[in-house]
Design a protein with these regions (language model features):
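Short gly/ser-rich anion-binding loops that grip negatively charged ligand groups
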Residues: 2, 28, 69-73
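A generic, lipid-embedded transmembrane alpha helix
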Residues: 1-11, 36-45
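A conserved hydrophobic secondary-structure block that centers on an alpha-helix together
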Residues: 56-130, 174, 181-185
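P-loop potassium selectivity filter motif centered on the GYG triad
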Residues: 20-61, 128-185
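Hydrophobic alpha-helical membrane-insertion segments
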Residues: 2-27, 109-129, 142-144
Length: 185
């Protein structure tokens, strides 16, 4: 199954320049970079050799990175559930159904918590939209480009699944990923 997800991620990352939800015109990753991104997010080490807001499109943030972060967190939870199930019995020949544990941990724990945390982040000012970069004038009168996007959708699973790989290049240090004290908790 992971091979299918890996191929899915590779195809989308390499061709992201032609996919929808790309208002900033980001180009596709090279094969080497897409390979590194897919492998690192599939095994939950989340090594980033790109800046999230400029190296990925909104589409690939949602349908590759966020998907992989759900899968890896649920995989770890399912493995732990199987181990706990086996340890709770005096003798056993099986440790349970991995697929069942995977689906339950995704749909009963990770998804509901991510939705709640995402709603909290939106109320605190974390961006959640599909508009392109904003051009603003600073107090000094200088033009600045501010990245936006579906940040409030990606950050919760990153935090719940103990994944790295932030939406912005500096991860949770970015003021839009962590705008208030409450969102920092």
């Amino acid at each position: 199954v992971n091979l299918i997800w890996f191929v899915w991620g590779m195809v989308l990352l390499v061709s992201q320049g032609y996919l929808p939800l790309n208002p900033d015109g980001n180009i596709g990753q090279t094969c080497h970079q897409a390979f590194n991104t897919c492998i690192s997010f599939m095994v939950n080490c989340n090594l980033q050799h790109y800046s999230g807001e400029s190296g990925l499109t909104y589409f690939t943030q949602l349908f590759v990175i966020m998907l992989f972060q759900f899968i890896t967190a649920a995989t770890g939870m399912a493995a732990m559930a199987g181990i706990m199930n086996a340890l709770s019995k005096k003798t056993t020949k099986t440790i349970g159904n991995f697929w069942d544990y995977l689906v339950l941990s995704s749909t009963r724990i990770l998804l509901p918590l991510s939705l709640v945390v995402g709603c909290i982040l939106i109320t605190q000012g974390t961006p959640m939209g599909f508009d392109g970069k904003m051009e603003v004038t600073t107090l000094e009168g200088v033009e600045q480009t501010i990245s936006q996007g579906p940040t409030a959708a990606v950050v919760p699973i990153k935090q719940l699944g103990t994944n790295g790989g932030g939406y912005f290049g500096v991860n949770s240090s970015h003021p839009l990923e962590n705008p208030t004290y409450l969102s920092n908790m």
